[in-house]
Structures are given as C-alpha cells and as structure tokens.
Amino acid sequence: MAKKLEITLTRSVIGRPQDQRATVEALGLKKLNSTVVKEETPAILGMINKVSHLLTVKEA
C-alpha cells in the first residue's frame, strides 16, 4: 500500500510564476493553510519538489 502524504500550503502564491500557481492548484490546494492528503506517487512527489518552498509535507 502506498504511503499517504499530508500536504499543507504554508506560503502564499501571490507574486509567484504562473507554473507554480498551477502546480499548487493541481495538488488541490486553494487557500493558505489548506491541507490535502495524497498518495505518494512519482507525479505527486515531482509537484511537491517544484513548489516545496511553499508547502509543508508530513506523512499521514
């Protein structure tokens, strides 16, 4: 069974490039401090890596 990751948006996307905004939205994060739980897949890990400076990630 794949691990679950708890992803929280901790920094604002205001002033960030459009590709970073799109990545945050693709993760399902809309507002500051919103949290989603996703399975650990290569695609999700790549998105997390791209915007890691905006997120906090924990194992769920």
Curated annotation (Swiss-Prot):
InterPro entries: Ribo_uL30_ferredoxin-like_sf, Ribosomal_uL30_bac-type, Ribosomal_uL30_ferredoxin-like. GO terms for molecular function: structural constituent of ribosome. SUPFAM superfamilies: Ribosomal protein L30p/L7e. It comes from Bacillus cereus (strain G9842). One of its GO terms (biological process) is translation. It holds the Pfam family Ribosomal_L30. This is Large ribosomal subunit protein uL30. Keywords: Ribonucleoprotein, Ribosomal protein. Part of the 50S ribosomal subunit. Belongs to the universal ribosomal protein uL30 family. One of its GO terms (cellular component) is cytosolic large ribosomal subunit.
